[in-house]
């Protein structure tokens, strides 16, 4: 097997709302994720179908404590360094900096927390990769404006960006504007703080919010380049190929349209203009975007420097209603199971070759450097009586995907900046709110009900990934 580039950014990725905890400490304000409960009410709230803008005593909220990285970050980053991380992707919690989302002055305690975190990364030679907004909308702005449906969210976001760019310009080189921006259409409350009134045109609201996020992203890219010459700002897509279930032309067409829909946001962020097909589709659907005169120029001038994406699985599309089957945990839905692939315990198809296909699709489409910022296997781990955790299934999954990455680099010639596995440490699942759906190399003693000591333990995969990084991917055994 060929080697990876010497400057390849190996590492792991987390999100503030899934790992930090301390939701009401250090001056932090309430965010949308803080009111998304665990249990049967979780999905109605995530999808904007049930209004919940405050916490109550009847629900458990996983993000409130999460894995308490707010108080454990030095221990956790030391463990990342032990594995040899060269890069750590994390997000800044908007409301830790601006508790109400648009405060005139930032919360100094929140700024100081990230100063300390970045300094800890730098101490070990770990490059931070920062997501500016990772499923994170201030509750105060949702109450005030209705989330990203309102144009005023753009200015609030850019104000937030201006603060963190100026504060961390000497500590952070790599930035992402929005996490999995395309998930706004599928999880509108999580992705954009959207709530829908009875009779409201939901598609109009979602695409209006999408336009506002796209304009905000472009303005952030432009601002970052002004404040931090030489920095790199990327977009972030929930990626994964859509395969036709059969070679029937209708299935092939359905898969092609699903792929095109999924790349809509990145088309705009990378090319600086709306694709013609998207304009026609909105026209047919009666969607009329409210825009401002300089929006086109803003989008054109604020294109991203690289394409980052998450990849967990591919999906299989058919128009045959008898073959349709909803895959558990597949938020995009509308897919049938692929008979040629095994699936995880949560119904996600395991498709390493699909990663290589996706990488080639993205590079052929955009001709920009790529960065895989999420990839991993959610699984139930067992702690043995001696405290060991044998997660060979996770090693097998990651090995197969890294092998395909190497082929994409050395055989296909693709420029790949780095690879950050999702959840290098166990954390709260964004979709289900579970802790038992574990991704990490590091086990965290906590269960779905919030019980546990929060003790950190190394799994077998910890030592395996350490070896992978040390050999630049040459030793995957």
Language model region names:
Residues 63, 70, 101-104, 345:
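Short, flexible active-site loop motifs that bind/organize anionic cofactors or intermediates
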Residues 58-72, 149-152:
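Active-site mouth loops of central-metabolism enzymes
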Residues 92-106:
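Glycine-rich, proline-tolerant flexible connector loops at the mouths of alpha/beta enzymes
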Residues 65, 69-78, 99, 110:
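Internal amphipathic alpha-helical repeat/solenoid segments
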Residues 1-57, 81, 100-102, 111-477:
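Active-site region of glycoside hydrolase catalytic domains
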